[in-house]
Amino acid sequence: MNRRRERVVVVGAGLAGSLAALYLARQGHEVDIFERRPDPRSALAGPEGRSINLGLSARGMRALDGVGLLADVLKHSVPMRDRVVHSPDGGVRAQPYGVREHEILHSVLREELISLVVSAAEAEPGVRFHFDSLLTSLDRETGTVRVAPTAGGEASTVTADLVVGADGVFSTVRQQMQHGLRANYAQDFLPWGYKELTIPVGTDGQPRVRLEALHVWPGHEALMVAHPNRDGSLTCTLFMAHEGPVSFAALDTPAAVRDFFRRRFPDAEELMPDLVREITEHPVGHLVTVRTAPWRYADRVVLIGDAAHAVYPFYGQGMNSAFEDCVVLDECLTAHPDRAAALAAYEAARKPHTDVLADLSTANFEDLRDRVHRLGYSASAAADRLLARLLPQRWVPLYAMVAHTTIPYADALARANRQDRILRRAGAGLTLAVGLAATAAALRVGRRRRAARR
């Protein structure tokens, strides 16, 4: 595809679609992006109840760096160095995200990130954004799309060499591309939903809790996480069942809201002066996983991001994996002059790993809900980190591989499983060795501190 200038249509100007457009434009192609929503940089655009904070990690950072955007994005982010776990009894415990200084996450506002990516893509020659434009049909054989203004009016037709479906979990491109094919499709809704809440800046202008961390309030029937913002506030996401005794439906009066938070998240309730209003007014979002195949048709159509592999948000990899799609698609289009071969290589390179990511995201939901506050979980994580410090070339915790490297997801899980088998076989002997190593490390630190005071 890199041999001549071609016309590409991208359907969806979200994060994945806009970044894909930028990569394709850098290959020298003419790119039209059609998006049913308004320009995200305009006052009319809204988050539609979706999470407005995102956790940027290594895969997403690599993708942004590939088009020269990383430094600018990091200026608009807040580093998250730890996961701070809040217990119902008011206790707080920090769990480091990694063992090395650079192993941190970055919290960024969705609206700021998408504005940066859209503006960068729009600045490229041959790139045109068409907002408030709804895809009504796709001819997968010819690459012809028909698009109508959302406000009504005459539809237009565009024929492209390649159509990129970046139109989200309920993708119209996917539906029309797979129509009549022997296609697999599975959609799994979690019985839980989510609602966005806020911990505002304190009356003194200072953050009400430690800012450079992801805060987690775990619980079997409800859990909450909070991402930091540059203004000192935090954006909270409350996860719980849609229906039932402990659910969003049950939070139907101010008294019910306050009683629920005082029992479940007592230290958070006092930090949220607008809690009742936000619970009442903010919409409940849905959580869904999508697995599908194929991701492409011949040399004409390809899917990226949620259109190909939506996952639950509990590993913080939805945006990062979508950005990684853009990198791999770019690499495949460069490596294979035959576009059909390039699209096949892209799907083969990505799908096995995004399937594993879906499983990891579900498992991490269970960890955040049930296990992250337990001492056994903390001890296991601490042992994992210690082994990584002692054996940096041989031992890497699963979370570190997923969040802080670009090791493909399935390869990361396979390596983590091998490490787990080693621990199980070694049993008490290795546990003792790790304990002795930890003691020795603590003694070394103590000696250094005493020497520094002399």
Swiss-Prot record:
Pathway: Cofactor biosynthesis; NAD(+) biosynthesis; quinolinate from L-kynurenine: step 1/3. One of its GO terms (biological process) is anthranilate metabolic process. It comes from the Bacteria. Its cofactor is FAD. The keyword Oxidoreductase applies. GO terms for molecular function: FAD binding; kynurenine 3-monooxygenase activity. The keyword Flavoprotein applies. Its EC number is 1.14.13.9. Gene3D superfamilies: FAD/NAD(P)-binding domain (3.50.50.60). SUPFAM superfamilies: FAD/NAD(P)-binding domain. It catalyses: L-kynurenine + NADPH + O2 + H(+) = 3-hydroxy-L-kynurenine + NADP(+) + H2O. Keywords: FAD, Flavoprotein, Monooxygenase, NADP, Oxidoreductase, Pyridine nucleotide biosynthesis. PANTHER family: KYNURENINE 3-MONOOXYGENASE. Catalyzes the hydroxylation of L-kynurenine (L-Kyn) to form 3-hydroxy-L-kynurenine (L-3OHKyn). Required for synthesis of quinolinic acid. Belongs to the aromatic-ring hydroxylase family. KMO subfamily. This is Kynurenine 3-monooxygenase. It comes from Salinispora arenicola (strain CNS-205). The gene is kmo.
